[in-house]
C-alpha cells in the first residue's frame, strides 16, 4: 500500500522523536513508558507489592515499567487481543478482557488478591476521522472503567487514556461518580499536538 503524505510525515516525526530514541537506548518497548514513569513519579501508583492489570498492553512499555516498580512482591497482568513478546515477571493473557474465558484466566491467577491498579493506554486503530476516532477511544475507556468497577479493591486506582472532545465531559462525570478523587494528567512525553489526556481515579465510592 502506498503511504500517504500524512503517514510519511508521522513516520519522520516518530523516527526523530526524542522519547522514541531514548526508549530504544534504554530498552523500553515504546515511548509510552516515559508517560507512565512520569505519572507514577507524581502520583505514586506503582507501589511495591501492588497487583496491577495492564489493559491493551501490547507492545508492553507500560508492563515493563510496572513490573520493575512493583518489585518481586507484586504481580503484573497484561491483557491484549494482540500477541506480546514475553516480559520477565509479567503474566500475559491474550484475548478480549470482556470475555468470560479471559476473565476466568485472570481470576484464577489472581486467587484471593485484589487489583490495586488498573491501567489502560488502549487506543483504537485510527481512521483519520476525528469524530470516529474520538468515539472509539472513549468506548475503550468506558470498557476499562467497567472492568475497574468489578476488579479493583476499594482503595484502588484506575489510570486511563482519553481524547479531549465529544463525550469527554460525559466520561469525566462517570469517573467522578465512580471514584472519590479524579485527576487529569498530560505527561511531557505526550506529543503537544495530541488530544490525549490521562484520567486518574482513586478510591472507589
Curated annotation (Swiss-Prot):
Q: Which InterPro entries match?
A: RNA_methyltr_RlmE, RNA_MeTrfase_FtsJ_dom, rRNA-MeTfrase_E, SAM-dependent_MTases_sf
What cystine linkages occur within this chain? Answer: none
Sequence positions that bind S-adenosyl-L-methionine:
60, 62, 80, 96, 121
Spell out the reaction equation it catalyses.
uridine(2552) in 23S rRNA + S-adenosyl-L-methionine = 2'-O-methyluridine(2552) in 23S rRNA + S-adenosyl-L-homocysteine + H(+)
User: GO: which molecular function terms?
Assistant: rRNA (uridine-2'-O-)-methyltransferase activity
Which family would the database say this protein is a member of? Belongs to the class I-like SAM-binding methyltransferase superfamily. RNA methyltransferase RlmE family.
In Swiss-Prot or TrEMBL terms, this protein is called: Ribosomal RNA large subunit methyltransferase E
Which species does this protein come from?
Answer: Dechloromonas aromatica (strain RCB)
Q: Which gene encodes it?
A: rlmE
Amino acid at each position: 500500500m502506498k503511504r500517504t503524505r500524512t503517514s510519511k510525515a508521522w513516520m519522520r516525526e516518530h523516527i526523530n522523536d526524542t522519547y522514541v530514541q531514548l526508549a530504544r537506548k534504554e530498552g523500553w518497548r515504546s515511548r509510552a513508558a516515559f508517560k507512565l514513569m512520569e505519572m507514577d513519579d507524581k502520583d505514586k501508583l506503582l507501589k511495591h507489592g501492588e497487583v496491577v492489570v495492564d489493559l491493551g498492553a501490547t507492545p508492553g512499555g507500560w508492563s515493563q515499567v510496572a513490573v520493575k516498580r512493583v518489585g518481586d512482591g507484586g504481580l503484573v497482568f497484561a491483557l491484549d487481543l494482540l500477541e506480546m513478546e514475553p516480559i520477565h515477571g509479567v503474566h500475559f493473557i491474550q484475548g478480549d478482557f470482556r470475555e468470560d474465558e479471559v476473565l476466568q484466566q485472570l481470576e484464577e491467577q489472581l486467587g484471593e488478591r485484589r487489583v490495586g491498579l488498573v491501567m489502560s493506554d488502549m487506543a483504537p486503530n485510527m481512521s483519520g476521522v476525528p469524530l470516529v476516532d474520538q468515539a472509539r477511544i472513549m468506548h475503550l475507556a468506558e470498557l476499562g472503567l467497567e472492568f475497574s468497577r468489578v476488579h479493583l479493591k476499594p482503595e484502588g486506582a484506575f489510570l486511563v487514556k482519553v481524547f479531549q472532545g465529544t463525550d469527554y465531559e460525559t466520561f469525566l462525570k462517570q469517573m467522578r461518580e465512580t471514584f472519590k478523587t479524579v485527576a487529569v494528567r498530560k505527561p511531557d512525553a505526550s506529543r503537544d499536538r495530541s488530544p490525549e489526556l490521562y484520567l486518574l481515579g482513586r478510591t472507589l465510592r
